[in-house]
Amino acid sequence: KASIIGELRHDASNVEVVAISKDKKWGLVNIGDVSGWTFMRFLRTRNRPDTALRLFCHGVEPTWSMSLDGDAVFKILNDDELFLGAIETIASLNSTDRLALRSKSVTGALTAHIGAQQCEDTTSNRAFGLSVNALITSDEGSAYYSGCCQLVP
C-alpha cells in the first residue's frame, strides 16, 4: 500500500493530470512539489477553462521561470525580474488543448504557446501536463525559451 501524500478537496479545481494509467483508472497529479495517483472516477474533464489560467512555467539552460497570474513576470536565475504586464489569452480556433498568451509592458513583451502535452523537467525528474514555448522581447533583444508549466491552485 502506498502512502498518502496529500488530498484533493471534493470541490478542487485546476487539478493537473499529467499521466493516466494503462487501465485509465488512475491519474498522476501534481500536488505542490510532489506527484501522486488519484482515482480518475472522482475527476471531471474540463477542456477549455472558464476562468483565467494561473500558471508557473520553468525551464533549464539557462534556468528560467515565469509566473502567469493575471500579469506575466519572467525571471532568469540570478537576474532581475522582467515585468511583462497583463496577459491576453488567445484560444485556438480549432483545438481545445492549446492556447496562446500575449503580454506587453514598457520593459518587454511575451508571446507564449501553451500545449496540453506531457513535459518532463530533467532537473527534478517530475512530469508536467503542460509545455510552453515563449518568446521574450526586452531592451536587450529577443530570446526563445522552452519548458514546462504547472497549474497554480
Where are these predicted regions, by residue range?
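Short, well-ordered turn and helix-capping elements at secondary-structure junctions
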Residues: A12, F42, A116-Q118
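Boundary regions of SH3-family modules and the immediately adjacent low-complexity/disordered segments
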Residues: K22, G27-S65, S124, G129-A134, ...
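Polybasic/polar functional segments that serve as interface/processing modules
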Residues: A91-K104, G108, A112-A127, N133-S142, ...
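A generic short-segment signal for beta-strand/edge and adjacent turn/coil regions
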Residues: G6-E7, K25, V34-W37, L43-T45, ...
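Central antiparallel beta-sheet cores of small beta-barrel/beta-sandwich binding domains
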Residues: H58-H113
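Beta-loop motif signature
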Residues: K1-K25
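Short polybasic amphipathic segments
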Residues: K1, D71-L77, L130-A134
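Short amphipathic beta-strand/extended segments with alternating polar/hydrophobic composition
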Residues: S3-R9, T38-M40, L77-N94, H113-I114, ...
